[in-house]
């Protein structure tokens, strides 16, 4: 495993992180606690030290599973978590929850996350899918600075989303706030991620890439020769069929990258 410092912070991360969303919510099929904990521990054994979760994953379970699986390794890992969604508000299916950003809510969300994680600090605390008006708000960043001073978080940033795009949000985060951004970036989906990376390099700001395997299309699981069926609870079930067909077409185009080597498509 290789490690590097997240630019603009003192956080040293493994270059490959673990996204806890996939093992803590029913959005990828049924949740299996034993399998999820085994995967987290296996990742740690292989050198992964950066684990990214959120309070909204599994209604808090995405943080609780971190405590259950990795609490004995707390000093060796970097925990990223996210906030901003009102967990007390009702949710319809896969629709987005209401967001809240007032100082009292943010502080309470942090305290609840600390309890679920079983730790007294969060390394990388991210505003979850914050919109431009929120990122422009000094109140939010004053609150986050207060959490840093209180020792409850080490540093903070913005998780840009929820889906691909959000150019203004990403650029404002990097250029004006000068804090790390978590973005969507993979071989299939390179824009606007490529632009964000260029700007971040110019500004000396870190970027964390998520969805590196294009929601499973780049992990070697799916090909034209294998039946592709998603569980009814899997969020990919609700995507347009064109998404899968387009992804398989792109997968055909990059076969040359690994056919003549010992590497896999995931690598």
Model-flagged regions — what are they?
Residues 22-34, 92-104, 129, 133:
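Active-site mouth loops of central-metabolism enzymes
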